[in-house]
Amino acid sequence: MPAVTYEHIKTCKQSGARLGIVHTPHGSFETPMFMPVGTKATVKTMSPEELRNIEAKIILGNTYHLWLQPGNDIIKHAGGLHKFMNWDGPILTDSGGFQVFSLSNLRKISEEGVEFRHHTNGSKLFLSPEKSMQIQNDLGSDIMMAFDECPPMPAEYDYVKDSIERTTRWAARCLKAHQRPGDQALFGIIQGGEYKDLREQSAKELVSLDFPGYAIGGLSVGEPKPVMYDMVEHTEQFMPKDKPRYLMGVGSPDALIECSIRGMDMFDCVLPTRIARNGTCMTSNGRLVVKNAKYADDLRPLDEQCDCYTCQHYTRAYIRHLVKAEETFGIRLTTIHNLHFLLKLMEDIRQAIREDRLLDFKDEFFEQYGLNVENPKNF
């Protein structure tokens, strides 16, 4: 039996969205689920206890960054990532591919792997499917990701076709190199840019390799949201119904709802933590930039409908003061709030699926959030 399995609970009669449970060696979580990103073995400014308090069930670690610092050997010596960072819930690690491909001017792709330069000191490094598997096996995450090529968007058709075929060959090498299938599940990543036939080809090739779960990669990289939704809707039909489906890099509230409707189970994004660090908050009524002068004497919480630690105890005026003064506590408070907001949104999505009313929920949320206008405020 694979290390990670998907249990289907129900399908929303109104929208077709899925309610399920993903079972892992470090516990189970209901889906659809948002996963906070802990790039360097920490969700920035948050303790594991605080993550548990806001009902985070699974978090991400970043293979590329942890390989370079502190090194996978040190984390292996500590007993794996769970022990190293004191998180006893499920962990998903990416393959390192996305980081390497975002260094586009510093890298060279071959069939063997990718040669690139260190993003800070310029030293030469090489990452291959086998190396990515070795690092992730050392990290000991519950869910590992296959090493894929993430083509830019837009890109020429022939380039993307070559790229997805290489990704399939690399995926087969990942399966062969993976040393711990009993306690770590390896997911395949479907690519294909904005070409529907290539998305279909990539999905079918990877499904034939029989991974225990599948991700859609290469979206949410700057393309218009309707293009992303179209690609997700098209690709979903070729993904197994009895395995988890992970949409990589998506974390805006509207996209989480839209892509849950389109059959996705798992999402991750640095968005809530990144915008929190410059004082931008997600609220029931849309985006709130707490640094703005109008909040200087505003004694209301960030969101009057929110019951997170921040909103229970602190005012907009105080948080604005902290952020303006560059006090770390301000960033902690906005991060707690944003992550709580998204995790609560996912809980509301799951409840709406239970009640067969996710499309109604979407309309209500969009109306209040300010997304039904001609040019909605975006993150």
Curated annotation (Swiss-Prot):
<feature type="active site" description="Nucleophile">
    <location>
        <position position="268"/>
    </location>
</feature>
<dbReference type="GO" id="GO:0002099">
    <property type="term" value="P:tRNA wobble guanine modification"/>
</dbReference>
<feature type="region of interest" description="RNA binding; important for wobble base 34 recognition">
    <location>
        <begin position="273"/>
        <end position="277"/>
    </location>
</feature>
<dbReference type="GO" id="GO:0008479">
    <property type="term" value="F:tRNA-guanosine(34) queuine transglycosylase activity"/>
</dbReference>
<feature type="binding site">
    <location>
        <position position="337"/>
    </location>
    <ligand>
        <name>Zn(2+)</name>
    </ligand>
</feature>
<dbReference type="InterPro" id="IPR004803">
    <property type="entry name" value="TGT"/>
</dbReference>
<keyword id="KW-0671">Queuosine biosynthesis</keyword>
<keyword id="KW-0808">Transferase</keyword>
<keyword id="KW-0479">Metal-binding</keyword>
<keyword id="KW-0328">Glycosyltransferase</keyword>
<dbReference type="GO" id="GO:0046872">
    <property type="term" value="F:metal ion binding"/>
</dbReference>
<feature type="active site" description="Proton acceptor">
    <location>
        <position position="94"/>
    </location>
</feature>
<feature type="binding site">
    <location>
        <position position="148"/>
    </location>
    <ligand>
        <name>substrate</name>
    </ligand>
</feature>
<comment type="similarity">
    <text>Belongs to the queuine tRNA-ribosyltransferase family.</text>
</comment>
<feature type="binding site">
    <location>
        <position position="306"/>
    </location>
    <ligand>
        <name>Zn(2+)</name>
    </ligand>
</feature>
<dbReference type="InterPro" id="IPR050076">
    <property type="entry name" value="ArchSynthase1/Queuine_TRR"/>
</dbReference>
<comment type="subunit">
    <text>Homodimer. Within each dimer, one monomer is responsible for RNA recognition and catalysis, while the other monomer binds to the replacement base PreQ1.</text>
</comment>
<keyword id="KW-0862">Zinc</keyword>
<comment type="pathway">
    <text>tRNA modification; tRNA-queuosine biosynthesis.</text>
</comment>
<feature type="binding site">
    <location>
        <position position="311"/>
    </location>
    <ligand>
        <name>Zn(2+)</name>
    </ligand>
</feature>
<feature type="region of interest" description="RNA binding">
    <location>
        <begin position="249"/>
        <end position="255"/>
    </location>
</feature>
<feature type="binding site">
    <location>
        <position position="308"/>
    </location>
    <ligand>
        <name>Zn(2+)</name>
    </ligand>
</feature>
<dbReference type="GO" id="GO:0101030">
    <property type="term" value="P:tRNA-guanine transglycosylation"/>
</dbReference>
<dbReference type="GO" id="GO:0008616">
    <property type="term" value="P:queuosine biosynthetic process"/>
</dbReference>
<feature type="binding site">
    <location>
        <begin position="94"/>
        <end position="98"/>
    </location>
    <ligand>
        <name>substrate</name>
    </ligand>
</feature>
<dbReference type="InterPro" id="IPR036511">
    <property type="entry name" value="TGT-like_sf"/>
</dbReference>
<feature type="binding site">
    <location>
        <position position="191"/>
    </location>
    <ligand>
        <name>substrate</name>
    </ligand>
</feature>
<dbReference type="Pfam" id="PF01702">
    <property type="entry name" value="TGT"/>
</dbReference>
<dbReference type="GO" id="GO:0005829">
    <property type="term" value="C:cytosol"/>
</dbReference>
<feature type="binding site">
    <location>
        <position position="218"/>
    </location>
    <ligand>
        <name>substrate</name>
    </ligand>
</feature>
<comment type="function">
    <text>Catalyzes the base-exchange of a guanine (G) residue with the queuine precursor 7-aminomethyl-7-deazaguanine (PreQ1) at position 34 (anticodon wobble position) in tRNAs with GU(N) anticodons (tRNA-Asp, -Asn, -His and -Tyr). Catalysis occurs through a double-displacement mechanism. The nucleophile active site attacks the C1' of nucleotide 34 to detach the guanine base from the RNA, forming a covalent enzyme-RNA intermediate. The proton acceptor active site deprotonates the incoming PreQ1, allowing a nucleophilic attack on the C1' of the ribose to form the product.</text>
</comment>
<protein>
    <recommendedName>
        <fullName>Queuine tRNA-ribosyltransferase</fullName>
        <ecNumber>2.4.2.29</ecNumber>
    </recommendedName>
</protein>
<dbReference type="InterPro" id="IPR002616">
    <property type="entry name" value="tRNA_ribo_trans-like"/>
</dbReference>
<keyword id="KW-0819">tRNA processing</keyword>
